[in-house]
């Protein structure tokens, strides 16, 4: 039952977002099976077409040539309207960041799909050898195609602004981490990321502006979200928002529409994270730094999605990813136990306020543990306690 729910939650991400590598872009590709319109028969061989994260801006020129490009009175008005539209189209929070070359990946990539014969007789294009994996032979990845970043070549424009938005994850589901149920809410958010990003891109294109919707690909999301005023970067490497803490997913849409950017905001996250270390204690892979203070990363410290000379707590993404593989589903322990991860109830409002008061910051973690919020912090105790099973 849990696995079926999980599959449904991830369905849009897997079936319609496309082959997006971690380095990401340009755009996305999906592999549906065409239907013969005369016989209504579904073909056994798939075709490759753009997915929801597509960068197809062919309609923009038509809008402009017809003199129908929407002209805003000011960058401020444009920003206000675009954020309002983003939330109407499904975003829970939205902000505007200026395009910053530092956050664009130095190499873009796409998983290389190859045909795999399935038991039902159909051919499925997969980035790994699925029959081999299903027969217990391990995961054999076919590799990645690499692209030099070139906005004008692949999207037809040079970005000026980035619309960054956040989608909330279910509180009750996340607190069961590292269960299949917590994976389901992660998958649901990933699926919604693609849908909402696509809608925002279509909205911009109909106004006569170029757009490139993206998930985790193309550029680093957290620093863009910080620039867009959506929150602060936490010890766990995630964006901490005032409303949801780290319990969300981030997506973004690049555009040539010049928008008034939002300003970064501070509300005590760094000061709190210096003392708390709860996420580091709860990480089963020990991928999160226990150092009291963030540090300026040197080139030798950086992983694929990190920039040198930026100040942050280091996160070992290889350790994190290895536990995901071992666990068989995503782990969200660092999200579940975070003291900023709260819902709108009076006692959680008090706890949220406590995280912003220096004298109470150290106590905020203890309050969580005393009242049993979100289960044991120790990862071994968490799995052995029955908490995950009981929550399901």
Protein language model features and the residues they cover:
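Iron-sulfur (Fe-S) cluster-binding modules
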Residues: 1-101, 105-112, 116-122, 158, ...
């Amino acid at each position: 039952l849990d696995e079926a729910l999980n599959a449904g939650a991830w369905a849009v991400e897997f079936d319609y977002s496309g082959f997006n590598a971690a380095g990401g872009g340009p755009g996305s590709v999906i592999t549906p099976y065409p239907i013969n319109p005369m016989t209504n028969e579904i073909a056994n061989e798939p075709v490759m077409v753009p997915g929801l994260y597509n960068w197809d801006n062919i309609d923009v020129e038509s809008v402009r040539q017809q003199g129908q490009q929407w002209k805003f009175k000011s960058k401020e008005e444009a920003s206000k309207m675009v954020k309002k539209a983003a939330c109407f189209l499904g975003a829970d929070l939205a902000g505007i960041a200026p395009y910053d070359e530092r956050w664009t990946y130095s190499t873009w990539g796409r998983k290389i799909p190859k045909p795999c014969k399935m038991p039902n007789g159909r051919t499925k294009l997969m980035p790994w050898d699925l029959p081999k994996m299903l027969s217990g032979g391990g995961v054999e990845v076919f590799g990645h195609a690499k692209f030099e970043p070139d906005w004008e070549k692949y999207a037809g424009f040079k970005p000026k602004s980035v619309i960054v938005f956040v989608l909330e994850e279910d509180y009750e589901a996340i607190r069961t981490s590292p269960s299949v149920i917590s994976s389901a809410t992660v998958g649901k958010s990933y699926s919604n990321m693609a849908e909402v990003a696509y809608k925002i891109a279509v909205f911009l294109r109909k106004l006569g502006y170029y757009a490139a919707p993206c998930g985790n690909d193309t550029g680093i999301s957290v620093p863009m979200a910080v620039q867009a005023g959506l929150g602060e970067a936490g010890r766990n490497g995630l964006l901490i928002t005032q409303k949801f803490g780290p319990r969300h997913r981030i997506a973004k849409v690049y555009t040539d529409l010049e928008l008034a950017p939002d300003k970064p905001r501070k509300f005590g996250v760094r000061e709190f994270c210096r003392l708390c270390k709860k996420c580091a204690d709860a990480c089963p892979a020990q991928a999160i730094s226990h150092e009291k203070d963030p540090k300026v990363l040197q080139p030798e410290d950086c992983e694929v999605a990190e920039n040198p000379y930026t100040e942050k707590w280091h996160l070992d993404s290889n350790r994190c990813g290895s536990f995901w593989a071992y666990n068989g589903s995503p782990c969200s322990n660092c999200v579940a136990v975070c003291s900023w991860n709260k819902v709108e109830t009076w006692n959680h409002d008090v706890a949220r306020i406590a995280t912003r008061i220096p004298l109470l910051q150290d106590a905020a973690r203890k309050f969580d543990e005393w009242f049993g919020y979100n289960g044991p912090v120790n990862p071994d105790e968490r799995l052995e306690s029955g908490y995950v099973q009981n929550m399901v």
